[in-house]
Amino acid sequence: MNVYEGSLVGTGLKAALVVARFNSLVTEQLLVGAADALRRHGVADGDVDVFRCPGTFELPAVLRRVVATGRYDAVVALGAVIRGGTPHFEYVSAEVTKGVAHVAMEAGCAVAMGVLTCDSMEQALERAGVKAGNKGAEAAAAAVEQANVLRAIARAPARKAE
């Protein structure tokens, strides 16, 4: 049995962070966490590009364009959808999740989801690292690991049919 896993070593990886501007109090903290995690895992600052889009709903379209350039090993979507008094939250959350998943399935690189869907601003800030933990950092670490497992798959020897 052969086991292929991705490591958390980001040396030599090129990464992109796609960040929604709406709810910037939260998304800027996600960005700080993601950038810090990439740095801690060995991705050079010069190998990280940040792309900003107006809101979380727009993330999948920008994400798709960034992935299509073929310049990145890992791409992370960062945004925040906060529940209000209308069904808008459900629509946006569902469509963004589907959109990011669709891009991830078609991508030739690692794509990670760092989009918060929260019931309140307080909850969003907690998940963005104001109290503890940062979902942006977690998504960036997942992207590094995924990029490395995709590399391992590409290098895996072909098996003979029996």
Swiss-Prot record:
InterPro entries per UniProt: LS (IPR034964), LS/RS (IPR002180), LS/RS_sf (IPR036467)
Similarity annotation: Belongs to the DMRL synthase family.
Pathways involved: Cofactor biosynthesis; riboflavin biosynthesis; riboflavin from 2-hydroxy-3-oxobutyl phosphate and 5-amino-6-(D-ribitylamino)uracil: step 1/2
Protein name listed in UniProt: 6,7-dimethyl-8-ribityllumazine synthase
Protein source organism: Anaeromyxobacter dehalogenans (strain 2CP-C)
Function according to Swiss-Prot or TrEMBL: Catalyzes the formation of 6,7-dimethyl-8-ribityllumazine by condensation of 5-amino-6-(D-ribitylamino)uracil with 3,4-dihydroxy-2-butanone 4-phosphate. This is the penultimate step in the biosynthesis of riboflavin.
Any single Pfam family the record assigns to this protein: DMRL_synthase
EC number: 2.5.1.78
GO CC annotations on file: cytosol; riboflavin synthase complex
Catalytic center residues: H88
Reaction catalyzed: (2S)-2-hydroxy-3-oxobutyl phosphate + 5-amino-6-(D-ribitylamino)uracil = 6,7-dimethyl-8-(1-D-ribityl)lumazine + phosphate + 2 H2O + H(+)
Binding annotation for 5-amino-6-(D-ribitylamino)uracil: F22, T56, F57, E58, A80, V81, I82, M113
GO MF entries: 6,7-dimethyl-8-ribityllumazine synthase activity
